[in-house]
Amino acid sequence: MLLFKLIVCFFFIFAIGANENKKDETSGENEPSENADVNSEASVVKEAFKKPASRKVNVKPPAAKPPAASKITKPQVPPQKKPPAPKQTTTKKPLLANIEGKIKGAANETTKYLTNLAKEMGKEAESALKEKAKEALTGLLDKADINGAFNAIASIWKNNENKPARYWKCAVENLSEETLVALGTTPYSGNVKTVLSDIPPQSTGVFVWESDSALTGAAGVVHYQLGDKILNIMASDPYDWTLYGAWANVRVSDNKETFDNLYSGKNGAQYPTKAGNWGIADGVKFFLTNNKEAEFQVIFSG
């Protein structure tokens, strides 16, 4: 029995030794794999560390920076910085207003000055024209001269080729002691085309009445005032003598006479003369001196 126990112990010890050797061999064989595992794990770790770096590159610049742009778009200029401008304008307003007022005042004064100057020049030109026209149209102022009056009007009137189809010239002799003051005209067809001027005593005035066109006559009334009376001179150079024969009429009355009264002999006016016959009305002689030139003469004795 004892021997059997010894044999069993021997085999048990031998088995333990064999197992230890096997463990050593297996452990030696397994070491490279462990190292490989360690290396693989290290590469994995490296790859893991590399990936975040690549992510950093791929990641766009901080997208959270738009707030900075929004800060720029937001009113950076504080509204509090604008008050200085209103302060300057408020302080300069009175000065600017004064300057503008002075400029406007100067402009108004200049405009008034130029306007008055133009008026004065116009008055001077008008008065000079009237004086020249008066000298030409009244003929000789020292004595009544029909020929001188007609010559004067011919020198300033149109040339024969430019004369209208119908017209009449009238020379008015003032044999009274008072001036015949020109009061204007009452047109019927056409109008006076020359200056109608006053006629001093013992002087002769002359004017020309023209038609408006070749298809109308020259007809109307010219008025002169002498004291409280009015000398009304009517003449009509008709477009067609066969249809309209009345030519001239004169009347001294208290008012301006109409063309119809003098042409038709109404309301106290006598019937007009025809074809240059002599006529006397209220002490005034009137007649056609030249039918071809339509020269009409009025002699006013007062």
From Swiss-Prot:
Keywords: Cytolysis, Membrane, Nematocyst, Secreted, Signal, Target cell membrane, Target membrane, Toxin, Transmembrane. Its main location: other. GO terms for cellular component: extracellular region; nematocyst; other organism cell membrane; pore complex. A motif (Cell attachment site) lies at residues 274-276. It is found in: Nematocyst; Secreted; Target cell membrane. SUPFAM superfamilies: Cytolysin/lectin (SSF63724). Residues 60-75 have a biased composition (Low complexity). InterPro entries: Actinoporin_PFT, Anemon_actinoporin-like, Cytolysin/lectin. GO terms for molecular function: channel activity; toxin activity. It comes from the Eukaryota. The keyword Secreted applies. Residues 76-86 have a biased composition (Pro residues). Residues 22-93 are annotated as: Disordered. Residues 1-17 form the signal peptide. The keyword Ribonucleoprotein does not apply. GO terms for biological process: cytolysis in another organism; monoatomic cation transport; pore complex assembly. Belongs to the actinoporin family. HALT subfamily. Octamer or nonamer in membranes. Monomer in the soluble state. In vitro, interacts with folate receptor alpha (of target organism). Composed of a long N-terminal alpha-helix and a core region rich in beta-sheet structures. Before the pore formation, the alpha-helix binds the lipid membrane, partitions into the lipid-water interface and stabilizes the monomeric molecule on the membrane. Finally, it traverses the bilayer, thus forming the transmembrane pore. Pore-forming protein that forms hydrophilic pores and causes cytolysis. Compared to equinatoxin-2 (AC P61914), it reveals lower cytolysis activity (5-12-fold difference, tested on erythrocytes), a larger pore size (probably 2-3 nm) and different affinity to membrane lipids (100-fold lower affinity to sphingomyelin). Binds to sulfatides. Shows cytolytic activity on HeLa cells, with a different potency than its paralogs (from most potent to less potent: HALT-4>HALT-6~HALT-1>HALT-3>HALT-7>HALT-2). This is Hydra actinoporin-like toxin 4. It comes from Hydra vulgaris.
